[in-house]
Amino acid sequence: MKITRSLSTVEVHTGGEAFRIVTSGLPRAPGDTIVQRRAWLKENADEIRRALMFEPRGHADMYGGYLTEPVSPNADFGVIFVHNEGYSDHCGHGVIALSTAAVELGWVQRTVPETRVGIDAPCGFIEAFVKWDGEHAGPVRFVNVPSFIWQRDVSVETPSFGTVTGDIAYGGAFYFYVDGAPFDLPVREAAVEKLIRFGAEVKAAANAKYPVVHPEIPEINHIYGTIIANAPRHPGSTQANCCVFADREVDRSPTGSGTGGRVAQLYQRGLLAAGDTLVNESIVGTVFKGRVLRETTVGDIPAVIPEVEGSAHICGFANWIVDERDPLTYGFLVR
């Protein structure tokens, strides 16, 4: 059998959200930064992303990451995040998945009771700490990038829901944060179609009306998704939220970068005190925890350094092939 390409992956989920780690088979991407390597792959090898994210190997809500060499002295490896629409700047559930895999599979030197993992991502360097008892990885906490409110109390007009008001905040990606209660949007599986329509309409309207540019990373220059908050199902949770991002993709986890942005938003609005913990619940009831480590600035913008905690589990290993004779080898999507 003659094949065009073979790709090896580790299959992980974080709070229910898939994360496919590509460990071999990728072309070597040139570049001194992760952003440069991402740009090269987007220009020269985007068909690999489509093959691994789209059906029949993936699905409309698939997510993954390409391992690459580190670009900073404290990192163990780098990652390029991929999804159904393209490439992202940050992925907190991906950081948790990568860190879990790195410790479970011995990609880093392991120490009891906690192992450090350094990751270079498009949004910058991220440091994670994984509980390790000598046999199994446990919860992961990571120090998020500086997070902040970009604009408060901004409004957009949507075709189906009218005027929607919320905050634009950054936690590794820009999100439009909004309360779902006024729009009868419970954060539950049964409401997913309405949540998707709402999130997609708000994201499109916000990107059209509010140009965003990260003060220090100009390549981060769009609103990645809508985060809709409402009441949780578990009494120990602070809130539930649903992130609709990329091309109408729904995060099954509570969204790591979104949790970082939410921590910044609540803290800067006086709704989360230093030392308090946000217990953030997902659409399927899984939980991330977030808290403020310290205050900082990004350019002239007041910001905080959040810590986000969650758990991931390896659920498989795979070898994928690309066969040019297959008319669907680079995938398709049916919603």
Swiss-Prot record:
Binding of substrate, residues: 92-93, 256-257
Lyase recorded as keyword: yes
InterPro entries: Hydroxyproline_Metab_Enz, Pro_racemase_fam
Pathway: Amino-acid degradation
Active site, renumbered: 91 (proton acceptor)
Effect of pH on activity: Optimum pH is 8.0-9.5.
Protein name: Trans-3-hydroxy-L-proline dehydratase
